[in-house]
Amino acid sequence: RDVGQHPAGRAFEVAAIGMHDAIATIPVWGWIVGFALLTTVINVFGIRMTARVTAWFLIGELLVLGTYLGVGGWALVEGRGSDLTGDTVLHALINPGTVTASLVFGAVSYAMLSFLGFDGISMLAEENRGGARQIGTAMRVALLVTGALFIAQSWMATLFVADPTRLIADGDPAGTAFYDTARVAGGPWLAALTAIATALAWGIANSLVAQVSTSRLLFAMARDRQLPRFLARVSARQAVPINAVLLVAALSLALGLVMANRDDGIALLSSLINFGAITGFVVLHTAVIWHFVIRHRSRRLVTHLLVPLLGIVLLIAVAINANIAAQRLGLAWLGLGAGVLVVLYATGRRPSLAGMGGQA
């Protein structure tokens, strides 16, 4: 999924546009090239370097988020933003008068992008020393923590939207709505802080994770003879799949540069990534049913049948409300993947997962 949609390319574009707004003397393409080179160099130096850099970025992001929430809370006490009445607090979370099923599912198709990182953890399974169970625990914890933080951040931002009606009607094509709420809450300095922090997080931290996880996926598939063998080459010094890292970097750079020249580049790329995630998760849920219920006759029907079926139904509902262009390209990519799978079966290179038993 991530290989087909190149989330790093979108991260480069979003970060470059944000930094160009802050430092206009450097063009968008210059920022894209700079972010691509920096993240590639860091990843080439190995997973320890990548983990160290992302850890520092995580600390910085949490400090900025804490600053935003703290300043926002103080601004509410001073009377800026919405009045903290019971109705206001409730409407900031959910407004029954304006919420429809199509609106919710359409929003979910975009919001999925914010949570794709948690499944990227699984790409580093071979470099984890704690076993498969630790990978699953890490994914669940990451999803719950980021979800809680996102809810808190979004709730606070909702209370500082200057013109909610216009925002709902026109959307946010420039991607500045959150920074506008920071300006209302704390002034230009808070808007600049959140904008630069977001841009650097996208351009470096998020891109690092996208690049490293996608390169590991390419490496594993090449090692299992499902992709060209050169992608399985590992650097003897740094123990990284060097060719896979460089290929992902090149494709992400190209995609970022192409989309930067489109007025709807960010929106289109977001839709493509999200629809790719949706279809990928549909296939994943289907695989769970096939592996446990059909192949191994599992009796744990709630875990291995009902839960995946519910997930498939919800994901299909979200996909129906996705961008039309994203639907077409996403289905085309899914069809291409199915074709590749047929070729692999026909040539005796059937995909397999080492260590998979009948139960989980």
Residue ranges and their predicted role:
Residues 1-27, 59, 64-67, 125-132, ...:
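Helix-loop-helix connectors at the membrane interface of multi-pass transporters/channels
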Residues 1-2, 8-25, 48-58, 194-198, ...:
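Transmembrane helix-loop boundary segments of multi-pass membrane transporters
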Residues 31-38, 71, 75, 92-160, ...:
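Hydrophobic, membrane-embedded alpha-helices of multi-pass small-molecule transporters
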Residues 1-10, 90-94, 138-208, 227-273:
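TM-loop-TM module centered on a large, flexible mid-protein loop between adjacent transmembrane helices
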Residues 24-27, 39, 231-238, 278-328:
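C-terminal membrane-solvent junction of multi-pass transporters and transport-like membrane proteins
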Residues 2-4, 60-92, 112, 156-161, ...:
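Hydrophobic alpha-helical segments and their helix-loop junctions in multi-pass secondary transporters
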Residues 71, 75, 271-277, 302-360:
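A generic transmembrane alpha-helix motif of multi-pass inner-membrane proteins
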Residues 2-47, 68, 85, 245-250, ...:
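Transmembrane alpha-helical segments of multi-pass small-molecule transport proteins
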